Amino acid sequence: MSSVFAAHRFPARFAVWRAFLPRVDIRNHAERAHDIRHGLSVTMLVLCAVLSACTKSENESTTHEMLNATLWRQSSAEYPAIARQTYRLASMNLDQALADPQWTAALEQKGNTTGLPPAIIADLDETILDDTSYEVRIIRWLGSYSPESFADWCREVNASAIPGAREFLDYAVAHGVAVFYYSARKESLRECTTRNLRHLQLPFPDETRLLLADRKSKSDYRADIAEHYRILLLLGDNMEDFVTGSRADPSVRIQLTDRYIQRWGREWIVFPNPMYGHWEAAPYGYDYQLPRTEQLRRKLRMLQ
């Protein structure tokens, strides 16, 4: 077949073949391509946003103001040594208190204490119970404390005992001393708190020994117990575990410490808590609604 003949016949053949091919809407393909490109763009934007959020969350975690304090509590060799040392001091002081009929730890204790059975009052969180796993959650996910997230943590019944706590409490009970626990936890957390104490096999004879915050202040609880017991020791990690008026300016809080200087390490046994407490909120006036940046700015101003 000659090339000229083929050239004349090709258009006709192409027309025949085209009759059997599906119709192609070029405009529709262009729109689909645009949609695909748009979808990929959106997907990439979402992916970038997620990765950015993850990076931001990780960066915020590594710069969270509680990171070093919580790390020290959980991983340092010094903290368990300090905790056991503090409980050992409490045991020695308990022996002295039992031998001295005039010994009392509560400022709320009035009148003659002769004949009253002995008791001690211990704060729970970060004195008896170790809640640092909750602080880890704050650092990694939450950003700051909230009553709801803390309640969720409490209901898991996963708090461990502070090193030395069980040995000291068993020692107190063996010497005929009643153990009372008071806490800033709410009444709605009574059942899970009770389960946690019993799970750790800590002395807990009945519900009257667990005193929770939304019924009375800690000072009122001390006054109530002082009517029926001679209070030998107070144990805690916050000033309000020992004395009223601690929710105050930092300078006032230090004045309270100085006023009762003879009681520290004797009737009053304090535990270190570098993670939270009234000390942390005092620089910004306990105004928890302030933006975090403003809270930090006011804390920075406190430094000398």
Q: What is the role of each PLM region?
A:
Residues P117-A119, I128-S160, A174:
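Active-site neighborhood of HAD-like aspartate-dependent phosphohydrolases
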Residues S41-V50:
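Bacterial N-terminal signal peptides
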